[in-house]
Design a protein with these regions (language model features):
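Carbohydrate transferase catalytic cores enriched for Leloir-type hexosyltransferases
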Residues: 1-215
Length: 215
């Protein structure tokens, strides 16, 4: 069933406003950032994202990059995640956990990022991917479960267990600016296909089919 998001998710071009929201969450204004926003549990594959983000910035000497991780925590996994980040030593300064993000701030954080990582191992739909697309943020996500149906050909789909695919995708999305711009434009257009009206129509059709089948 195709879901949707609130109408407040839009691409924001006001740099001053974006910087204001970044400051609210402690994101340095002199840093570029790669963004991930999700419920922080093991199936979101966050340790994989962090590991490959660090490979990306080290290989390409991108000292001005950080990885911004937003979302609510599952307590047991938070401890595991924190331990992994602490074990990074000096590199841990490149990982910024900002916790829960207020709804009214999400569009600004999406709009201010370089790309969105969502290599989830399993999704029923993948609303954060749709939110990012609506806000003009190019997406790298898994090629599994529902995510290919959401992203279509508007981003890069990877094997969520492949370090090499993730690294290549990040390099493609950052260094190929024409490709990145095409992903932004196509993502915004594709996101318009997902509406709550369409969701209601699909549910209604399914219910009617079930009722007719049951007669």
């Amino acid at each position: 069933i195709p879901l949707s998001t609130g109408k407040e998710y839009v691409k924001i071009g006001d740099i001053d406003y974006i910087n204001q929201v970044k400051s609210k969450y402690g994101i340095p204004l002199d840093k570029k950032y790669i963004f991930s926003l999700c419920n922080l549990d093991p199936r979101k594959n966050l340790i994989f994202s962090i590991k490959n983000f660090l490979r990306f910035v080290e290989k390409n000497n991108l000292d001005n990059f950080i990885f911004v991780l937003g979302g609510s925590y599952f307590k047991d996994f938070e401890n595991i995640l924190n331990e992994n980040i602490e074990n990074l030593g000096e590199k841990k300064d490149k990982i910024l956990k900002i916790g829960y993000v207020d709804d009214e701030d999400m569009s600004a954080l999406y709009s201010g990022a370089e790309m969105f990582l969502f290599p989830s191992l399993y999704e029923g739909f993948g609303i954060p991917v749709l939110e990012a697309m609506k806000c003009g943020l190019p997406v790298i996500c898994s090629n599994t479960t529902s995510l290919p149906e959401v992203i279509g050909d508007c981003g890069i789909k990877i094997n969520p267990y492949s370090d090499s695919e993730m690294l290549s995708a990040m390099e493609k999305m950052y260094f190929d600016r024409d490709f990145r711009e095409k992903c932004i434009i196509k993502g915004i257009e594709r996101s318009k296909l997902f509406t709550w009206e369409k969701c209601v129509d699909v549910i209604s059709e399914t219910i009617n089919e079930d009722l007719q089948f049951g007669k």
